[in-house]
From Swiss-Prot:
This is HTH-type transcriptional regulator TrpI. Activates the expression of the trpBA genes encoding the two tryptophan synthase subunits. In the absence of the inducer (indoleglycerol phosphate), TrpI binds upstream of the trpAB operon, overlapping its own promoter region. GO terms for molecular function: DNA binding. GO terms for biological process: L-tryptophan biosynthetic process. The keyword Transcription regulation applies. Keywords: Activator, Amino-acid biosynthesis, Aromatic amino acid biosynthesis, DNA-binding, Transcription, Transcription regulation, Tryptophan biosynthesis. It comes from Pseudomonas putida (Arthrobacter siderocapsulatus). Belongs to the LysR transcriptional regulatory family. The lineage of its organism: Bacteria, Pseudomonadati, Pseudomonadota, Gammaproteobacteria, Pseudomonadales.
């Protein structure tokens, strides 16, 4: 998975 967390 490739998630960009703020």
């Amino acid at each position: 998975m490739a998630h960009d967390l703020p």
